[in-house]
Protein backbone atom coordinates (compact mmCIF):
# COMPACT_ATOMS: atom_id res chain seq x y z
CA UNK A 1 0.00 0.00 0.00
CA UNK A 2 0.98 3.64 -0.47
CA UNK A 3 2.99 5.93 1.73
CA UNK A 4 1.07 8.28 4.03
CA UNK A 5 1.31 11.89 2.86
CA UNK A 6 -0.68 15.08 3.31
CA UNK A 7 -3.69 15.23 1.01
CA UNK A 8 -3.80 11.49 0.36
CA UNK A 9 -7.35 11.60 1.67
CA UNK A 10 -9.56 14.17 3.46
CA UNK A 11 -8.40 14.73 7.02
CA UNK A 12 -4.84 13.56 6.50
CA UNK A 13 -2.83 16.71 7.22
CA UNK A 14 0.93 17.20 7.26
CA UNK A 15 0.85 17.47 11.05
CA UNK A 16 -0.97 14.13 11.32
CA UNK A 17 1.48 12.49 8.92
CA UNK A 18 4.47 13.68 10.97
CA UNK A 19 2.92 12.49 14.23
CA UNK A 20 2.23 9.06 12.74
CA UNK A 21 5.74 8.81 11.31
CA UNK A 22 7.06 9.54 14.78
CA UNK A 23 5.39 6.27 15.83
CA UNK A 24 6.91 4.49 12.77
CA UNK A 25 3.59 4.46 10.93
CA UNK A 26 4.65 5.38 7.39
CA UNK A 27 2.29 3.47 5.10
CA UNK A 28 -1.42 2.73 4.78
CA UNK A 29 -0.63 -0.87 5.73
CA UNK A 30 1.10 0.33 8.92
CA UNK A 31 -1.98 2.34 9.88
CA UNK A 32 -4.32 -0.55 9.07
CA UNK A 33 -2.36 -2.88 11.37
CA UNK A 34 -1.86 -0.38 14.21
CA UNK A 35 -3.68 -0.31 17.54
CA UNK A 36 -5.57 2.96 17.08
CA UNK A 37 -6.30 3.44 20.78
CA UNK A 38 -2.59 3.26 21.57
CA UNK A 39 -1.73 5.51 18.62
CA UNK A 40 -4.34 8.06 19.69
CA UNK A 41 -2.91 8.21 23.22
CA UNK A 42 0.75 8.44 22.20
CA UNK A 43 0.25 10.87 19.32
CA UNK A 44 -2.37 13.06 20.97
CA UNK A 45 -4.85 12.47 18.13
CA UNK A 46 -8.58 11.85 18.25
CA UNK A 47 -9.45 8.15 18.29
CA UNK A 48 -12.63 8.75 16.27
CA UNK A 49 -10.67 10.74 13.71
CA UNK A 50 -8.14 7.92 13.34
CA UNK A 51 -10.91 5.34 12.89
CA UNK A 52 -12.53 7.49 10.20
CA UNK A 53 -9.17 8.06 8.55
CA UNK A 54 -8.41 4.35 8.44
CA UNK A 55 -11.87 3.57 7.05
CA UNK A 56 -11.41 6.06 4.21
CA UNK A 57 -7.90 4.83 3.38
CA UNK A 58 -8.94 1.16 3.37
CA UNK A 59 -11.80 1.96 1.00
CA UNK A 60 -9.43 3.94 -1.20
CA UNK A 61 -6.70 1.29 -1.34
CA UNK A 62 -8.74 -1.91 -1.32
CA UNK A 63 -8.67 -4.05 -4.44
CA UNK A 64 -11.54 -3.73 -6.91
CA UNK A 65 -11.99 -5.92 -10.02
CA UNK A 66 -11.09 -4.41 -13.40
CA UNK A 67 -11.74 -5.82 -16.84
CA UNK A 68 -9.01 -6.37 -19.39
CA UNK A 69 -9.96 -3.38 -21.53
CA UNK A 70 -9.63 -0.98 -18.60
CA UNK A 71 -6.29 -2.47 -17.63
CA UNK A 72 -5.00 -2.09 -21.18
CA UNK A 73 -6.07 1.57 -21.33
CA UNK A 74 -4.33 2.19 -18.00
CA UNK A 75 -1.21 0.48 -19.34
CA UNK A 76 -1.13 2.71 -22.45
CA UNK A 77 -1.40 5.90 -20.43
CA UNK A 78 1.03 4.96 -17.64
CA UNK A 79 3.85 3.09 -19.41
CA UNK A 80 6.91 4.82 -20.86
CA UNK A 81 9.79 3.21 -22.75
CA UNK A 82 13.21 4.65 -21.88
CA UNK A 83 16.17 4.09 -24.18
CA UNK A 84 19.30 2.65 -22.58
CA UNK A 85 21.55 4.55 -24.98
CA UNK A 86 22.87 1.25 -26.38
CA UNK A 87 21.19 0.47 -29.69
CA UNK A 88 21.70 -3.30 -29.65
CA UNK A 89 20.50 -3.55 -26.06
CA UNK A 90 17.37 -1.52 -26.84
CA UNK A 91 16.67 -3.94 -29.68
CA UNK A 92 16.95 -6.87 -27.30
CA UNK A 93 14.65 -5.19 -24.75
CA UNK A 94 12.02 -4.34 -27.38
CA UNK A 95 12.90 -0.61 -27.57
CA UNK A 96 14.30 -0.05 -24.07
CA UNK A 97 13.46 -0.11 -20.37
CA UNK A 98 9.76 -0.18 -19.51
CA UNK A 99 8.40 1.76 -16.55
CA UNK A 100 6.46 -0.48 -14.21
CA UNK A 101 8.94 -3.33 -14.58
CA UNK A 102 12.09 -4.66 -12.91
CA UNK A 103 14.91 -5.43 -15.36
CA UNK A 104 17.82 -7.56 -14.15
CA UNK A 105 21.34 -7.58 -15.59
CA UNK A 106 23.17 -10.80 -14.72
CA UNK A 107 26.87 -11.47 -15.23
CA UNK A 108 30.09 -12.61 -13.65
CA UNK A 109 32.85 -10.36 -12.30
CA UNK A 110 34.16 -8.00 -14.97
CA UNK A 111 31.32 -8.73 -17.38
CA UNK A 112 30.34 -5.06 -17.64
CA UNK A 113 27.21 -4.84 -15.50
CA UNK A 114 28.23 -1.56 -13.88
CA UNK A 115 29.31 -0.08 -17.23
CA UNK A 116 25.87 -0.79 -18.69
CA UNK A 117 24.20 0.74 -15.62
CA UNK A 118 26.32 3.89 -15.91
CA UNK A 119 25.47 4.17 -19.60
CA UNK A 120 21.76 3.87 -18.80
CA UNK A 121 22.03 6.56 -16.12
CA UNK A 122 23.93 8.92 -18.44
CA UNK A 123 21.50 8.47 -21.32
CA UNK A 124 18.34 8.88 -19.24
CA UNK A 125 19.73 11.98 -17.50
CA UNK A 126 21.10 13.67 -20.64
CA UNK A 127 19.14 12.49 -23.67
CA UNK A 128 15.77 11.94 -21.96
CA UNK A 129 16.29 14.61 -19.26
CA UNK A 130 14.77 12.41 -16.55
CA UNK A 131 15.92 11.94 -12.97
CA UNK A 132 17.84 8.81 -11.96
CA UNK A 133 18.57 7.27 -8.56
CA UNK A 134 21.75 5.18 -8.61
CA UNK A 135 22.09 2.90 -5.56
CA UNK A 136 25.69 1.70 -5.30
CA UNK A 137 26.11 -1.25 -2.94
CA UNK A 138 29.48 -2.58 -4.09
CA UNK A 139 31.55 0.58 -4.62
CA UNK A 140 31.75 0.13 -8.39
CA UNK A 141 30.21 3.45 -9.39
CA UNK A 142 32.79 6.08 -10.41
CA UNK A 143 31.94 9.69 -11.16
CA UNK A 144 34.83 9.97 -13.64
CA UNK A 145 33.37 7.23 -15.86
CA UNK A 146 29.93 8.80 -15.63
CA UNK A 147 31.36 12.15 -16.72
CA UNK A 148 33.22 10.42 -19.56
CA UNK A 149 29.94 8.96 -20.83
CA UNK A 150 28.30 12.38 -20.70
CA UNK A 151 31.24 14.04 -22.47
CA UNK A 152 30.79 11.54 -25.29
CA UNK A 153 27.22 12.76 -25.69
CA UNK A 154 27.80 16.51 -25.46
CA UNK A 155 30.74 18.91 -25.28
CA UNK A 156 28.58 21.55 -23.59
CA UNK A 157 29.75 21.70 -19.96
CA UNK A 158 26.46 23.23 -18.80
CA UNK A 159 24.53 20.29 -20.25
CA UNK A 160 26.99 17.88 -18.65
CA UNK A 161 26.50 19.56 -15.27
CA UNK A 162 22.73 19.56 -15.72
CA UNK A 163 22.73 15.83 -16.49
CA UNK A 164 24.93 15.10 -13.46
CA UNK A 165 22.47 16.98 -11.25
CA UNK A 166 19.71 14.66 -12.43
CA UNK A 167 21.63 11.61 -11.19
CA UNK A 168 21.41 11.08 -7.45
CA UNK A 169 23.88 8.55 -6.04
CA UNK A 170 23.26 6.72 -2.77
CA UNK A 171 25.80 4.31 -1.32
CA UNK A 172 24.11 1.54 0.63
CA UNK A 173 26.21 -1.38 1.81
CA UNK A 174 23.63 -3.23 3.92
CA UNK A 175 20.07 -4.30 3.27
CA UNK A 176 18.56 -2.39 6.20
CA UNK A 177 19.79 0.95 4.95
CA UNK A 178 18.67 0.05 1.44
CA UNK A 179 15.16 -0.82 2.63
CA UNK A 180 14.89 2.44 4.59
CA UNK A 181 16.09 4.40 1.59
CA UNK A 182 13.61 2.75 -0.81
CA UNK A 183 10.71 3.33 1.59
CA UNK A 184 11.63 7.00 1.91
CA UNK A 185 11.93 7.20 -1.87
CA UNK A 186 8.37 5.94 -2.26
CA UNK A 187 7.04 8.83 -0.24
CA UNK A 188 9.25 11.32 -2.05
CA UNK A 189 8.16 10.17 -5.52
CA UNK A 190 4.50 10.18 -4.53
CA UNK A 191 4.84 13.74 -3.22
CA UNK A 192 6.72 14.86 -6.35
CA UNK A 193 3.99 13.44 -8.58
CA UNK A 194 1.35 15.24 -6.55
CA UNK A 195 3.17 18.56 -6.97
CA UNK A 196 4.10 17.89 -10.65
CA UNK A 197 7.82 18.31 -9.89
CA UNK A 198 10.55 16.19 -11.46
CA UNK A 199 10.18 12.68 -10.08
CA UNK A 200 12.71 9.86 -10.36
CA UNK A 201 12.01 7.77 -13.48
CA UNK A 202 14.79 5.18 -13.22
CA UNK A 203 16.13 3.43 -10.11
CA UNK A 204 19.36 1.45 -10.57
CA UNK A 205 20.51 -0.94 -7.82
CA UNK A 206 24.08 -2.16 -8.41
CA UNK A 207 23.99 -4.74 -6.97
CA UNK A 208 21.30 -6.64 -5.04
CA UNK A 209 23.64 -9.58 -4.52
CA UNK A 210 26.08 -7.50 -2.48
CA UNK A 211 23.51 -6.81 0.25
CA UNK A 212 21.44 -10.01 0.08
CA UNK A 213 23.99 -12.82 -0.38
CA UNK A 214 25.63 -12.36 3.08
CA UNK A 215 22.22 -12.99 4.68
CA UNK A 216 21.48 -16.28 2.93
CA UNK A 217 22.54 -19.76 3.97
CA UNK A 218 23.63 -21.17 7.30
CA UNK A 219 21.55 -20.32 10.34
CA UNK A 220 20.50 -16.87 9.11
CA UNK A 221 16.79 -17.60 8.74
CA UNK A 222 15.74 -14.00 8.29
CA UNK A 223 17.75 -13.64 5.09
CA UNK A 224 15.03 -14.93 2.77
CA UNK A 225 12.40 -12.71 4.40
CA UNK A 226 14.61 -9.63 4.01
CA UNK A 227 15.32 -10.52 0.38
CA UNK A 228 11.61 -10.77 -0.39
CA UNK A 229 10.95 -7.51 1.44
CA UNK A 230 13.52 -5.88 -0.83
CA UNK A 231 11.81 -7.46 -3.83
CA UNK A 232 8.47 -6.06 -2.67
CA UNK A 233 9.87 -2.54 -2.32
CA UNK A 234 11.34 -2.66 -5.82
CA UNK A 235 8.09 -3.95 -7.31
CA UNK A 236 6.05 -1.26 -5.57
CA UNK A 237 8.38 1.41 -6.94
CA UNK A 238 7.99 -0.02 -10.43
CA UNK A 239 4.29 -0.80 -10.58
CA UNK A 240 2.63 1.71 -8.27
CA UNK A 241 4.85 4.72 -9.00
CA UNK A 242 5.69 4.13 -12.67
CA UNK A 243 9.46 3.74 -12.27
CA UNK A 244 11.80 1.66 -14.42
CA UNK A 245 13.89 -0.41 -11.97
CA UNK A 246 17.23 -1.90 -13.04
CA UNK A 247 19.13 -4.30 -10.77
CA UNK A 248 22.35 -6.25 -11.22
CA UNK A 249 22.94 -9.80 -10.03
CA UNK A 250 25.92 -12.13 -9.96
CA UNK A 251 26.36 -15.63 -11.34
CA UNK A 252 26.82 -18.74 -9.23
CA UNK A 253 27.53 -22.37 -10.07
CA UNK A 254 24.78 -24.96 -10.18
CA UNK A 255 24.73 -27.71 -7.56
CA UNK A 256 26.74 -30.04 -9.79
CA UNK A 257 29.28 -27.31 -10.58
CA UNK A 258 28.84 -27.67 -14.33
CA UNK A 259 26.68 -24.68 -15.19
CA UNK A 260 26.32 -21.09 -14.09
CA UNK A 261 23.02 -19.59 -13.03
CA UNK A 262 21.84 -16.26 -11.55
CA UNK A 263 22.48 -15.92 -7.83
CA UNK A 264 19.85 -15.55 -5.06
CA UNK A 265 17.93 -18.69 -5.96
CA UNK A 266 14.51 -19.58 -7.28
CA UNK A 267 12.57 -17.20 -5.03
CA UNK A 268 14.34 -14.18 -6.53
CA UNK A 269 13.92 -15.45 -10.10
CA UNK A 270 10.26 -14.34 -10.05
CA UNK A 271 11.13 -10.73 -9.17
CA UNK A 272 12.47 -9.34 -12.49
CA UNK A 273 10.12 -9.13 -15.47
CA UNK A 274 13.07 -9.07 -17.85
CA UNK A 275 16.50 -10.64 -17.39
CA UNK A 276 19.57 -10.31 -19.59
CA UNK A 277 22.87 -12.17 -19.30
CA UNK A 278 26.19 -10.44 -20.00
CA UNK A 279 29.02 -12.74 -21.01
CA UNK A 280 32.49 -12.37 -22.51
CA UNK A 281 32.29 -13.12 -26.22
CA UNK A 282 33.84 -16.44 -27.21
CA UNK A 283 36.86 -16.03 -29.44
CA UNK A 284 37.11 -12.33 -28.60
CA UNK A 285 40.85 -12.66 -28.40
CA UNK A 286 42.67 -11.17 -25.44
CA UNK A 287 41.67 -11.58 -21.84
CA UNK A 288 40.95 -7.87 -21.57
CA UNK A 289 38.57 -7.79 -24.54
CA UNK A 290 35.62 -5.43 -24.14
CA UNK A 291 33.33 -7.44 -26.43
CA UNK A 292 30.30 -8.81 -24.60
CA UNK A 293 27.44 -11.05 -25.67
CA UNK A 294 24.05 -10.02 -24.29
CA UNK A 295 21.46 -12.80 -24.12
CA UNK A 296 17.79 -12.34 -23.28
CA UNK A 297 16.88 -15.08 -20.79
CA UNK A 298 13.52 -13.79 -19.56
CA UNK A 299 11.02 -11.40 -21.13
CA UNK A 300 7.24 -10.80 -21.16
CA UNK A 301 7.40 -9.59 -24.79
CA UNK A 302 10.33 -11.11 -26.67
CA UNK A 303 11.28 -14.76 -27.27
CA UNK A 304 14.09 -15.82 -24.97
CA UNK A 305 17.45 -16.77 -26.41
CA UNK A 306 17.84 -13.64 -28.54
CA UNK A 307 21.41 -12.36 -28.54
CA UNK A 308 23.21 -9.15 -29.39
CA UNK A 309 26.78 -7.95 -29.03
CA UNK A 310 28.03 -4.79 -27.31
CA UNK A 311 31.44 -3.29 -26.70
CA UNK A 312 31.62 -2.00 -23.12
CA UNK A 313 34.82 -0.17 -23.96
CA UNK A 314 33.01 2.12 -26.39
CA UNK A 315 29.70 2.58 -24.59
CA UNK A 316 28.59 6.13 -25.07
CA UNK A 317 31.25 6.96 -27.64
CA UNK A 318 29.58 5.38 -30.63
CA UNK A 319 26.62 3.15 -31.40
CA UNK A 320 27.88 -0.33 -32.08
CA UNK A 321 25.71 -3.28 -32.92
CA UNK A 322 27.99 -5.77 -34.65
CA UNK A 323 26.53 -8.90 -36.08
CA UNK A 324 26.86 -11.83 -33.73
CA UNK A 325 27.83 -15.08 -35.43
CA UNK A 326 25.05 -17.61 -35.07
CA UNK A 327 22.70 -15.06 -33.52
CA UNK A 328 19.25 -16.45 -32.78
CA UNK A 329 16.28 -14.50 -34.12
Curated annotation (Swiss-Prot):
What top-level branch of life does the organism fall under?
Answer: Eukaryota
Q: Where is this region: preferentially binds ssDNA?
A: 1-83
Kindly give the InterPro entries that the UniProt entry links to this protein: AAA+_ATPase, DNA_recomb/repair_Rad51_C, DNA_recomb/repair_RecA-like, HRR_RAD51_Paralog, P-loop_NTPase, Rad51D_C, RAD51D_N, RecA_ATP-bd
Subcellular localization, as worded in the UniProt entry = Nucleus; Chromosome, Telomere
Q: Does the keyword DNA damage apply?
A: yes
- Tissues where the protein occurs: Highly expressed in brain followed by testis. Also expressed in heart, liver, kidney, spleen, lung and skeletal muscle.
Q: Cite a single GO MF annotation.
A: ATP-dependent DNA damage sensor activity
Task: Describe its assembly.
Answer: Part of the BCDX2 complex consisting of RAD51B, RAD51C, RAD51D and XRCC2; the complex has a ring-like structure arranged into a flat disc around a central channel. In the absence of DNA, the BCDX2 subcomplex XRCC2:RAD51D formed a multimeric ring structure; in the presence of single-stranded DNA it formed a filamentous structure with the ssDNA. Interacts with SWSAP1 and ZSWIM7; involved in homologous recombination repair. Interacts with BLM; required for stimulation of BLM activity by the BCDX2 subcomplex XRCC2:RAD51D.
Q: Null mutant: what phenotype?
A: Midgestation lethal.
Can you name this protein? DNA repair protein RAD51 homolog 4
Q: Which residues bind ATP?
A: 107-114
Q: Where is this region: Interaction with XRCC2?
A: 4-77
UniProt organism field: Mus musculus (Mouse)
Q: Name one GO cellular component term.
A: centrosome
Q: Which CDD domains match?
A: Rad51D (cd19489)
Family affiliation: Belongs to the RecA family. RAD51 subfamily.
Gene transcribed to yield this protein? Rad51d
Keywords attached to this entry:
ATP-binding, Chromosome, DNA damage, DNA recombination, DNA repair, DNA-binding, Nucleotide-binding, Nucleus, Telomere
Q: What is its main location?
A: nucleus
SUPFAM superfamilies associated with the record: P-loop containing nucleoside triphosphate hydrolases (SSF52540)
A GO BP annotation: telomere maintenance
Renumbered to this chain, region (Interaction with RAD51C) spans 77-328
* Task performed by this protein: Involved in the homologous recombination repair (HRR) pathway of double-stranded DNA breaks arising during DNA replication or induced by DNA-damaging agents. Bind to single-stranded DNA (ssDNA) and has DNA-dependent ATPase activity. Part of the RAD51 paralog protein complex BCDX2 which acts in the BRCA1-BRCA2-dependent HR pathway. Upon DNA damage, BCDX2 acts downstream of BRCA2 recruitment and upstream of RAD51 recruitment. BCDX2 binds predominantly to the intersection of the four duplex arms of the Holliday junction and to junction of replication forks.
Amino acid sequence: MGMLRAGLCPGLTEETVQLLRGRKIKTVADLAAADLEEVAQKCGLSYKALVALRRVLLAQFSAFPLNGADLYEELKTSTAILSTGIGSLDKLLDAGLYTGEVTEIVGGPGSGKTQVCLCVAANVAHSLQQNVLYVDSNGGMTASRLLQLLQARTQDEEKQASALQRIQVVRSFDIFRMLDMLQDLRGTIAQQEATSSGAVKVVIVDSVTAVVAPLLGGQQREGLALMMQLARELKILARDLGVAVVVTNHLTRDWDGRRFKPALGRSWSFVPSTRILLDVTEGAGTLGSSQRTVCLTKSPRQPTGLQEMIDIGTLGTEEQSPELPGKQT
